[in-house]
Amino acid sequence: MFLKKLLKGSSNSTRPRGATFNGIYTGGDNLSGSSEQNYNNSLTTSTKQTNRQTLLLKSMEYINGSSTYYGNYMDYFDIPVQLFVGGEQSEIYPMLSYNQSLKSLILDFNKITEIPDCITLLPNLNHLSLAANQLTHVPEFLSQLKSLETFEIGINQFTCFPLNVCKIKSLTSLHLETNNIKSLPEEFLNLVNLKDLSLFDNQLKEIPDSLPNNIEKLNLGCNDISSSKSDSLIRISHSLTTLNLSENKIEELDESLSCLVNVKTLMLDCNMIKVIPGSVLGSWKSLVTLNLPHNLISDLPPEVILLSNLRIIDLRGNNFENCKKLIPTESSTPISFKIEDFIQNKERINSLKFDNIEILPTTNSIINSNNNNYEVITTTATTKNIIENKEDNDEKLLNNSTISIVLDSNNKSENNEINENNQLLTTDDDYNTDKNDSFTESEDIIKKIQIELDSIEIQQKQLLLKQIKLKEKMKKEKNKLFKFQQQEIIHQEQLPQSKPENEKLTNIPEQQQKQQQQQQQQEVQQPIITLTKSTSSKVEVEMIVPNQLIFWQSIVPDLIIDKLYLGCRECAMNKSWLKDNNVTHILTVANFKPLYPDLFKYLIINIEDVDEANIYQHFKEMNAFIDEGREKGGVLIHCRAGVSRSASATMAFIMMKNSLKFQEAFDITIKGRPRIYPNIGFINQLKKFEKDLFK
């Protein structure tokens, strides 16, 4: 059938509507109906000419030998015949040849209904993208493409998972966004090479069980998943680094999510999560980016401070009332927040910091407090190492018979409590008692040991404080020395005939310089732990993670007229703000799935932001919906950016409700939201709507 289409298209001078020849579109579906015809008549001649020129520019001739072909938005019904050139002639299709060169074929946003078997004439095809077409199934012969690794078939018409995909064993990346898939077959486990899977915007009710074992990136956003419990996530936790569960219906984070120890990016946007369990969050040691916007969270667990790799955390649209109170109402100056500001349990923060400070005791070290000769105990500044070594260090601390300490001059009395040989009174000989000792004597011994342990703990904290100060001072001096060495190098380059007095000091090898620079970068990226002494003589720990970004102030829509808001898609995500401002209706002028159908009433107008799109036909329906929303509470109108489609819908309502002309409605709308910019096609339709209103 495919060959007949090609032969027919290449021999007839008058081709069927929508046919393709040499990669150029020769005609397509026209708008039908009275509304569409009126709209076409309203377009100016110059606009039509511009559209034809744009269409010609979009067409791309395939150059023989090219490895990539783009044919997006071409209204193709089939794969262009021009691609099958340059190689051995096919026996099945005599007019076509094998193309060994083509490796990437991208035909998104066309009208392809099926994948023809002649695609097997592209044996080295590595990337096939047929997104936004009209596919309903995947043929079995596609598995003959042994080099195919990336397959993109999102935004098609699949009502169930295409089983033949499970036979393409070479796949490493599969994209099936925006279909109607409800589950995954067991055969899907056969794709052992699959690393990147996107099932965004489908109808999954739960996290699928049949996830291949080596998945690294998993996108399950915008489904109907209500439970975060999943055995499959535990099974793939060894490889999983990116997980997207945003725009679902998750209310609780199951303890099984503690398995995500290798995940670096976790997205939980737009769910119904109220609490983040500390035991779960504290397990995400590798986490770099954590997205939690537009949930119902009012408090972060203190364990978040232990995530030493965390650099970005998004908390927008949540219920952090304490942080809201800190913002001055009359100042536009941005306020800087620390992660501790979002944690209510401050005592737990300090406890965690103390518990995760690493003390490494040394042995056989003699301290002379008179001449200030002492040995500095080496510790690590990374929280990761602190946590990993904590238990071992605690055990060493109890077993070691000697310890090195550094004391201030005002702590000499405490120093006297340690004997001259620094022997701790914790050995069996120090507290050897007879079997007939009384119970009272045992209690006294226990108290004595406890006092000794408390004294040691105080000394350790003092030691750590001084040690950190010394390390900071040493770090500064090293930086000074490094800068001095660099200046000397520059100076010697300017005076090539003069020899440096100390060649070892000034002539640093290039490899050594790189190592020093890398070491400095690593030091900057590591968390810094400092101890400070408060006025109450209580030692406090401050843990600072440099370069950490916290997002929590979300974008809100603009009020155009009473009870009518205009904004972008993010504004429609902010359920807390919407509920606080009594919004009951949401008009979405784009192809977006309702996020909170249980909280708000939605009207979805599926229309693209292009000049040719017919928004005029939806004015009546949209105006009635906006009217209803304003009567019951308030209405938000949004598209993707809140600039063109939603702005046009807003102006149409203002024109209808107040009997205003287009320019008057435009002035009102742009005053409330200065960034609006409707496309020329929408403007022409609004002007036509004006004529209809004033007939």
From Swiss-Prot:
Q: Name one GO cellular component term.
A: cytoplasm
Q: Which GO terms describe its molecular function?
A: phosphoprotein phosphatase activity; protein serine/threonine phosphatase activity; protein tyrosine phosphatase activity
Superkingdom assignment: Eukaryota
Record EC number: 3.1.3.16, 3.1.3.48
Q: Which Pfam families match?
A: DSPc, LRR_1, LRR_8
The active site is formed by 639
State where composition is biased (Low complexity): 413-426
The record lists the catalysed reaction(s) as: O-phospho-L-tyrosyl-[protein] + H2O = L-tyrosyl-[protein] + phosphate; O-phospho-L-seryl-[protein] + H2O = L-seryl-[protein] + phosphate; O-phospho-L-threonyl-[protein] + H2O = L-threonyl-[protein] + phosphate
Q: Which UniProt keywords apply?
A: Hydrolase, Leucine-rich repeat, Protein phosphatase, Repeat
* Enzyme class, UniProt record, top EC level: hydrolase
For the region Disordered, give the residue spans.
413-438, 492-519
> Transmembrane segments in this chain: where?
none
Every copy of the Tyrosine-protein phosphatase domain together lies at 556-695
Q: Which GO terms describe its biological process?
A: negative regulation of MAPK cascade; signal transduction
Functional note: Probable phosphatase with dual specificity toward Ser/Thr and Tyr-containing proteins.
Q: Which family does it belong to?
A: Belongs to the protein-tyrosine phosphatase family. Non-receptor class dual specificity subfamily.
Kindly provide the name given to this protein in its UniProt entry: MAP kinase phosphatase with leucine-rich repeats protein 2
Q: Which organism is it from?
A: Dictyostelium discoideum
Q: What is the lineage of its organism?
A: Eukaryota, Amoebozoa, Evosea, Eumycetozoa, Dictyostelia
